[in-house]
Amino acid sequence: RLDNKSDFNFSTESLKVKLNKYALLTLHRPSNVDFEIKFKEIVGAINKISKEIPIIFSVHPRTTKRIKEFNIEFSPNVFLIGPVPYLEFLNLWRDAQVVLTDSGGLQEETTALGVSCVTIRENTERPVTVSKGTNLLAGTAAKDIEHSFRMSLKSPQKKLRPISLWDGLAAMRIVEILRWV
């Protein structure tokens, strides 16, 4: 059963997980969830990883449909929750040991807060999160997801990762360019 945002109290204790001792999972991209064989392979990796660490899976509505359609089952250590409001979701991934995702935005947000991230995709439109951030690009094969997860655990403890040009001064730089033009 998926708890919806109105009855989930956002306490990791209610899920029997401890701060910084769980993984947060999100999957929503059609390329990952709309094809049964690929989705089941990804879930196989997730179920194996859950033997090492509890996983909180914030399930997108389109993903919920595919879980039912493909009759996908998760191990008992994968806790499925419905979508949650942004600030509560931010707390979930900020307090996670690692985030497993196919979301582009989460790659940036985890890098900004120094949270390890494993991106379950073949490519990323945010390469700076891999080269200078906390993101590992895993691909979608089960063995690669599992390997990247284990590599993420070897990452240094959380610390803010300043990325050049992520300093909040974009408007000032644009004005300077416009003055030059």
Where are these regions (language model features)?
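A donor-sugar binding/catalytic signature common to diverse glycosyltransferases
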Residues: L92-V130
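Short, structured helix-loop element that forms part of the nucleotide-activated donor/catalytic region
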Residues: P61-N77
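A nucleotide-sugar donor-handling region in carbohydrate enzymes
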Residues: R1-F35, A138
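Acidic, amphipathic alpha-helical patches
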Residues: F39, Y86-F89
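A conserved nucleotide-sugar
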Residues: K18, V43-V59
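Leloir-type glycosyltransferase catalytic cores
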Residues: R1-F8, L136-V181
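A short acidic/histidine/glycine-rich donor-binding loop in glycosyltransferase catalytic cores
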Residues: V118, G133-A138
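Active-site donor-binding acidic/aromatic loop of nucleotide-activated sugar
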Residues: N77-P85
